[in-house]
Amino acid sequence: MAAAAGAEGRRAALEAVAAPERGGGSCVLCCGDLEATALGRCDHPVCYRCSTKMRVLCEQRYCAVCREELRQVVFGKKLPAFALIPIHQLQHEKKYDIYFADGKVFALYRQLLQHECPRCPHLPPFSLFGDLEQHMRKQHELFCCKLCLKHLKIFTYERKWYSRKDLARHRMQGDPDDTSHRGHPLCKFCDERYLDNDELLKHLRRDHYFCHFCDSDGAQDYYSDYAYLREHFREKHFLCEEGRCSTEQFTHAFRTEIDLKAHKTACHSRSRAEARQNRQIDLQFSFAPRHSRRSEGVVSGEDYEEVDRYNRQGRAGRASGRGAQQNRRGSWRYKREEEDREVAAAIRASVAAQQQEETQRVEDREEGSRPKKEEAAARVPEEPRGHRRLPRAQGEGSGSKEASANGPVSQEAFPATGPGPVVALSNTLPPPSPELKEEDFPSLCASTSSCCTAVTPGSVGLALAYPGPPRGKNTFQEEDFPALVSSAPKPSSAPSSLISAWNSGCSKKGNLPTPGSQAVVGGSQPPRKAGKGSRGGRKGGPAPVDEEDSGGLTVQGLRSVPTTVAVSSLLAPATNQSSAKVGKKKKVGSEKPGATSSPLLPPDHTPKPSGAEQVLEAPLSKAEVPVTIVVNGHSEGSALVRSAPKEPPGLPRPLGPLPCPIPQEDFPALGGPCPPRMPPPPGFSTVVLLKGTPPPPPPPPGLVPPISKPPPGFSSLLPSSHSACAPSPTTTTTTTTTTKTPGLAPTPQAYLVPENFRERNLQLIQSIKDFLQSDEACFSKFKSHSGEFRQGMISAAQYYKSCRDLLGESFQKIFSELLALLPDTAKQQELLSAHTDFCSREKPPNSRSKRNKKNVWQTSTQQLGLDCCVCPTCQQVLAHGDVSSHQALHAARDDDFPSLQAIARIIT
């Protein structure tokens, strides 16, 4: 024990001799003078300032030289080795474990931690830094930087105090005397400054978002919230937004498309049932109640349902009788389900076969020689169950089948027009039969005449008598297919057959009711189910009339086209007024065979309107029908308007209901033994040639003449509207394709919307704003003038003048597009007329303009400096780029009434 103590004493003596005296020199950390030394167990001396800053301000107790943890340190001026210092005898700071060698060193330590005012040395030190800060703000208007106060661990005497201006410069740019500090950086998302870039980066990483793909590539892009980061993922990378991934963050973004596909395959793959369920579309629809057709001898689905119910009841009875035996047999339920499936499959097959049979029957009926309008009149009163019944007139009793609304019908109501035989019959209606009768398919070109019968006052109905034998629905006779080029019919028999055909259409299956009774019956009938046989019908709406609404052309329509010989005989000897009247009244009879006709008038009292009155009848009748919206040739109206039969353009409709049938006196013979008058062929609204007048002028320049020689009587007809609609290289005219009385311009039709209508409107508005230099007052004035012109409050000339006043010479640059995008054909014509008048006033008139002054629409738009053309069919002003699409719209609409050349090509 004594030996150990002696060895320890000798080691301490050697260390005391070998260790140099602590004190003097400079600090290895701050390079300052060592007024007082801080020494720890590792014997690495540092100045007391650095040790105090580490242990008191930074709360770090390791050695700044060797990083050894120092639990105790000694402050003194000249210190031996730490092991030789008797620390238990020294003054002690318990909070920080600092020992002081003497009182002077302790005073230096206390002075480092005092809060003294640099401007007021006579004041005692403040106990807290907050008190000093308040004193500096109130007494000296000096402030310290909050960021530096929070992050910089320095003594109070080392703090800098700034005025307001200097503090702002310090935060943004830094101190002029300290080039190492360049200000505190700003976060643009939060509008908050941080001590340095490291602190700003910590904030961005912690409180904002960055792309981990771009960050791994070295890009330093940050986003304020995840919405912007999601948009970045969507644009630059691959983002999954299916199912739960639409609400996930970070994990639903992928670097490559292959990773995205692998993710979708792994996480979003569905089973076949789920995929099939996702492809299904739920449709809410209902069927009208289906009436039984058992009385007509047709096997329907109700028969199968009745058999199925009987089988189920029989199985239930047998099951109650031998319940124990069926309990032992476990497969009876499976057999029952198999039987149910077989019955359901049989029902579906039967219903499909029945629908196919009905469709075939309707198509056969349409392909027969029955006229379209008579087929419509026969379909509308048809009922699904029971016998076929005819509509009754108002005031008719329930016992009578059919009676005249104006009393008994005499022979004068249906006079014969020729010397043909007259057959008078008085009988009741024949019993209905499923076979088609000859009345449903009258021949239009029969050589023999059959007139309507006279009915005695005691008769109950009317029936037609035909000289030919009755035929089945699929039996065709020779008179149903007349020769296309044949000799002219006999003068005496042809008018008789024509009148017989109109009267058979008017009195088919009996006398016709009044318009009021027809409307009542039509409103009381149940709607027919829209099936495959109905063309163009709508679900739950009224039944379609016939194939005419869909624009088709049946065999009967082809046969109703007159031959070239018959048309040429029609065109030659007729007068203007009488032939136009006969053509119109016969078209009314052919288009509406089920409607009543005009009252009885003698031939000398028949009104003969002039050509202008005939043209103006169509707009007057159009104003009374319900308004429909026409977009690119397709009408968007009510179901009642759609269900009405379509009429060819130019056909005036009657202004009101007429109570009496058409008498023969309304169709007088115009030329004695001349051929019969027939309605104009399809594609021609009115064909008029004045007797003794020169033929119409030749086609205007720009229209291509027909390729082949026209048939006799058609030398003055122009080509179809399809070729006339295309602009010519030299000039563009508005000549229509139908032969008209000279001086009559075609009526403007509905506006057909061109392609890219909305985008072009926006471009036009932007061009107007640019020309007005974004002047809102001028633009508002332009819009008000445009609205007044559209509403008819100002004329086209006033509107044209106001636009020129606003836009000046720039108006000429946008006038063509403004005119083409004006959604009103009539307003287009007015505005073009105003432009033509302005150009005629600007330029001196020459001989050519005087020659064309008769019709302003024959003036070329290119001569007026316009980049547009006028459609000769509907009078719509078009840009040159819109001509082809506009022509296609007309071609689609003209399929309902094709030209004679198209019919000839179809027949041959």
UniProtKB/Swiss-Prot annotation:
Chief location: cytoplasm
Record-listed Phosphoserine modification sites: 295, 433
PROSITE patterns referenced in this protein's UniProt entry, alphabetically: ZF_RING_2, ZINC_FINGER_C2H2_1
One Pfam family from the record: zf-C2H2_13
Catalytic activity line of the entry: S-ubiquitinyl-[E2 ubiquitin-conjugating enzyme]-L-cysteine + [acceptor protein]-L-lysine = [E2 ubiquitin-conjugating enzyme]-L-cysteine + N(6)-ubiquitinyl-[acceptor protein]-L-lysine
Zn-finger (C2H2-type) residues: 185-208
GO MF assignments: ribosome binding; ubiquitin protein ligase activity; zinc ion binding
Modified residues (Phosphotyrosine): 304
Annotated metabolic or biological route of this protein: Protein modification; protein ubiquitination
The enzyme's E.C. designation: 2.3.2.27
Tagged with keyword Zinc: yes
Low complexity composition-biased segments: 313-329, 482-501
KW Disulfide bond (keyword) present: no
Zinc finger (RING-type): 27-67
Purpose of the protein: E3 ubiquitin-protein ligase that plays a key role in the ribosome quality control (RQC), a pathway that takes place when a ribosome has stalled during translation, leading to degradation of nascent peptide chains. ZNF598 is activated when ribosomes are stalled within an mRNA following translation of prematurely polyadenylated mRNAs. Acts as a ribosome collision sensor: specifically recognizes and binds collided di-ribosome, which arises when a trailing ribosome encounters a slower leading ribosome, leading to terminally arrest translation.
Identification of the protein by name: E3 ubiquitin-protein ligase ZNF598
Organism of provenance: Mus musculus (Mouse)
Source lineage: Eukaryota, Metazoa, Chordata, Craniata, Vertebrata
